[in-house]
Amino acid sequence: MIIQYQRLDEYVKIPTRSNPSDAGLDVYANLRDPIIIEPRESAIIPTGLKFGIPHGYMLQVMNRSSIAAKRGLMVGAHVIDSGYDGEIFINLHNVGHSPQMIRYGDKIAQLVMVPVVAFRPNLIEGDLYREPITISDRGDGALGSTGG
């Protein structure tokens, strides 16, 4: 699948994929001046990129494992819908214990193209605390209920 994109100026770094089999496309910080993200704080980082996302797809912004593990920087959950045609910004959270500097050209996130299945919710009236919506072997056990 080929996706059209634009750089907002000539200095914006082109997204890269380290290996042909990688799911994500790495994107870079497009900053004039470095910024510092203090522990337990966030910053919105511009990429200088716009993407033409086809109908029936979305871009999901994901962590890069290296900055999450080495620097304590996590990407805030992002879904970029096909109708959005503005610049992509990355919401970075510093969950570590030391300030982190972000500079122009730093790899900050990866974009993954995901097919979207449109759904329409159907409200079921009644006492859902007594009657499950569906019957399954798993049941209604929540976090950690299947072991591990």
Predicted regions and their residues:
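DUTPase catalytic domain/fold
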Residues: 1-148
